[in-house]
Amino acid sequence: MIRLLSTRFKFRTLLIFLFLLAVIDPVLKQFGQVGLNFLDVLFTISLLTALYSISGNRKILLSGILLVAPIFFLGWTGFAKNEFYLGLVMYTFAMAFFGFVAVSIIIHIVAEESVTMDLIYGSACVYFLLGFMWAIGYGLIELLIPGSFSVGGHVLTRIDYLSQYGFLNDNLSYFSFVTLTTLGYGDVLPLSPPAKSASTLEAIVGQLYIALLVARLVGLHTSQSMAKKREKKGLEEICKPLLEKDQANTQKKQ
């Protein structure tokens, strides 16, 4: 566990919890309150791990703390339960936090000069963070404009996020990742104009991110390979005169 939480593998740690949150969320909600409580803990750990992943820069870390603090306060104290406006505040901060962490990791990826496994883990984390950010955004749209989504042909009248601490509605989380990957099964549909615009934007961002990420990683790998070749060539040029001198001395002795 110490190795898992080391600074070197902080993105791998975040990726593990984000993956679990995405996959286990619909399953846990089938177990009633026990499942919801476990989901609350998993969501909290995911937020803390996301905060830890950006802890390398003090200013960025402080900004992250300011964003995540209202989420914990309103969520764990229960003040946001059944309070519409406090709920909106909490989910707005949650959406902003996921977006902030995603942008922070993207900046880190762009600044890197070599391809490492942790860089690849970080790139995958951004993809999950974008999915969760949009999932919460869809929840906000549904709260503000009831009936914005249709699930299995049934138009939602109101999703009561405020009755529990769990932020992620399994249907909208599922819809978010399906949209992000442009699978488009059609079982969950956006109906209101804001919902349609948000889903269109997510599909565009999802495809652009993959394309730009691949281009960035290929560029880094190419420059890294060229740098190694130049370094090897430089060492050969430095060592060549020394080798020739040694060979000449050996021939003289013979």
Which residues does each PLM region occupy?
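Long, low-complexity, intrinsically disordered cytosolic termini of multi-pass membrane proteins
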Residues: L235-Q254
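Pore domain of cation channels
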Residues: G166-A227
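Structural signature of hydrophobic alpha-helical transmembrane segments
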Residues: Q30-F43, G87-F97
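Cytoplasmic-side transmembrane-helix entry/capping segments in multi-pass membrane proteins
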Residues: K59-A69, G87-A94, M117-A124
